Amino acid sequence: MSKPEYFIGLMSGTSMDGVDAVLVDFSAEHPVLIASHTEAIPAHLLKGLQRLCQPETDEINRLGRLDRSVGKLFAQAVNHLLAKTTVTAAEVIAIGSHGQTVRHMPNLEMGFTLQIGDPNTIAIETNIDVIADFRRKDIALGGQGAPLVPAFHQQVFAQPGHSRVILNIGGIANITYLPGNSEQVLGFDTGPGNNLIDAFIQQNLNQPFDEDGAWADSGTTHPDLLKQLLSHSYFSLAYPKSTGRELFNRAWLEQQLADYSHLDQQDIQSTLLDLTCHSIANDINKLSPNGELFVCGGGALNKALMQRLATLVPGYKVDTTSALGVDAKWVEGIAFAWLAMRYHHDLPANLPAVTGASRTAILGGRFKAR
């Protein structure tokens, strides 16, 4: 039996609903998930991060402090993950840390993306090398720096003769199109995933998320509001494209709802869920009228979302990635362990057709524990 090749993946997405940590063995043909853990983000830290995502005063001081605090939190996630296993820090080759995105603006004249969660702090607190800063090389090459998971999806989920779409629904939703033939793999952000439905229920019912989409399902979608939301210019942009909280956030939502204050809250929630489903389905149906659709990320656990989406893509067989042997909740975490493994072996990890970069590249940088 070959010696295990352990890497840890760390991911906290735009929904900021916790830090996902996974321990993965890459010694076999397919990655094997050994253990997983979600570290809650403390309320004070969450508040600070949400505030930092919007332009304000005194940003640099707050950024510096939060960078260290998020690094400590990510390290804690690793230590709690390993405590669940018999694997020691010395046996782990490296940690792949995505960090926490606080600004993603790739389309400016001098485009940039910024993730915080100091990798030096993670390395020192865990005694494991950290590979981080995966997105900025792609941006330096003229790309969007996102999405990065399609290269991983291609390696793990592509099957000749099968036209597949892998849909990741975090705060933002992104799709990877695996045509099953020699055609190019495509991938891009479709728009809002869970971020608006989470924000609206947090604001009105003080619940972290709409479990199973039950609140949305108790309402009725308002067609005029849905049409207005879908008229956002992002949805008509050609790919490669990526987005984040900079476009789809509470401030934008409040602006959109200004003329609809008379609606019942559950009707607004239903409309927001349909915004997610319609924007995803419109892009999937454009890529191919039929095929297989496998969903991962937090949205895969939302029953109402899955049901509504399935009705909008009638030509697709819909399931979660768990049906392909990769637990839907942990796909992104595993992808960042995979990105660390690619860096360690000097292998490129971006797909220029997806991000718009001028070439493939080895992504990230290594921060040593010693």
Curated annotation (Swiss-Prot):
ATP binds at G13, T14, S15, M16, D17, G18, V19, D20. Its EC number is 2.7.1.170. NCBIfam families: PRK09585.1-3, PRK09585.3-2. Keywords: ATP-binding, Carbohydrate metabolism, Kinase, Nucleotide-binding, Transferase. SUPFAM superfamilies: Actin-like ATPase domain (SSF53067). Catalyzes the specific phosphorylation of 1,6-anhydro-N-acetylmuramic acid (anhMurNAc) with the simultaneous cleavage of the 1,6-anhydro ring, generating MurNAc-6-P. Is required for the utilization of anhMurNAc either imported from the medium or derived from its own cell wall murein, and thus plays a role in cell wall recycling. Pathway: Amino-sugar metabolism; 1,6-anhydro-N-acetylmuramate degradation; Cell wall biogenesis; peptidoglycan recycling. One of its GO terms (molecular function) is phosphotransferase activity, alcohol group as acceptor. It is an enzyme of class 2 (transferase). This is Anhydro-N-acetylmuramic acid kinase. Belongs to the anhydro-N-acetylmuramic acid kinase family. It comes from Shewanella frigidimarina (strain NCIMB 400). The gene is anmK.
